[in-house]
Amino acid sequence: MSWQEKINAALDARRAADALRRRYPVAQGAGRWLVADDRQYLNFSSNDYLGLSHHPQIIRAWQQGAEQFGVGSGGSGHVSGYSVAHQALEEELAEWLGYSRALLFISGFAANQAVIAAMMAKEDRIVADRLSHASLLEAASLSPSQLRRFVHNDVTHLARLLASPCPGQQLVVTEGVFSMDGDSAPLAEIQQVTQQHNGWLMVDDAHGTGVIGEQGRGSCWLQKVKPELLVVTFGKGFGVSGAAVLCSSTVADYLLQFARHLIYNTSMPPAQAQALRASLAVIRRDEGDARREKLVSLIARFRAGVQDLPFTLADSCSAIQPLIVGDNSRALQLAEKLRQQGCWVTAIRPPTVPAGTARLRLTLTAAHEMQDIDRLLEVLHGNG
């Protein structure tokens, strides 16, 4: 089989399964409205959970940062790309979340890959929730360490895996809020069993940070858990992009020496760091509380109105509200029907989710209004 035949076969298989991914060029993709092909849609696909991507103070902070620092960082943080803006953001994040140190990364994917690659050796073991994000599972699969997966949120199964002999160290990996189901991990129970077996806990709280807990401190703070490694990302609740790893001072020093994604990547622009500082300020103040409270009300309105639909509604109290349809083609058809009625919704299919669980991944944000939720419910009930 030639290269071209190999590529064609893979694409043909995706098409045959109604699983071929595609991109849509949009004129505006975050916030309440999505604009594509000169048409405006109510946007139920954005991860901009607090509606901060268009916040004027955050936009102005980025503009002022670009005027002060330029539009790029100029290099790796180990060379010339670590600015006073990066330093200030790291210090503010560490203070906010109660850690000694924070290290910035260009993306959550990079942060997860970097930590696992740097921390794990052949004699070690990673024990990961089966539904962990692709960045975590890919990094674990590529690691020389052993990978074992526990049944989603099943602490008993986790304990059984941790109890089997391991010559090295054990790292338990999970998410705070799961990206495709919107449910939360029982972090207190997971931490307890991890500590009983002398392991470390790594939590990716991409979808909880900024959105839940006191001052938006996220899933771990809400459940009174402090993992050894906490990954937070800035493309969701913060409305920007990038990520950070929160950890002890010695672990931060270690990652600065051995995390290749940190050493060899160009740092995020200092202007971006300034925007993130402005976003953090909004998240922590009363305005952040008001946005979180509004989001909770919108979620409650949606869940109350969707109960009698012929789909499985995931057990989620988060901004992620999946309607599990099952069949790929049915999910695509329903997403298209919603778009025709002015609601932009994304169909998520295998391999992103398990076979037979294709779904509409609906996301609600504080930028929505109650009438937006009512319109979505009207269309879902076939009355659009």
Swiss-Prot record:
The keyword Iron is assigned to this record: no
EC numbers for this chain: 2.3.1.47
Superkingdom, taxonomy of origin: Bacteria
Positions where N6-(pyridoxal phosphate)lysine occurs in the chain: K236
InterPro entries: Aminotrans_II_pyridoxalP_BS, Aminotransferase_I/II_large, AON_synthase_class-II, AONS_Archaea/Proteobacteria, AONS_Proteobacteria, PyrdxlP-dep_Trfase, PyrdxlP-dep_Trfase_major, PyrdxlP-dep_Trfase_small
Subunit-structure text: Homodimer.
Protein's recorded name: 8-amino-7-oxononanoate synthase
Organism: Shigella boydii serotype 18 (strain CDC 3083-94 / BS512)
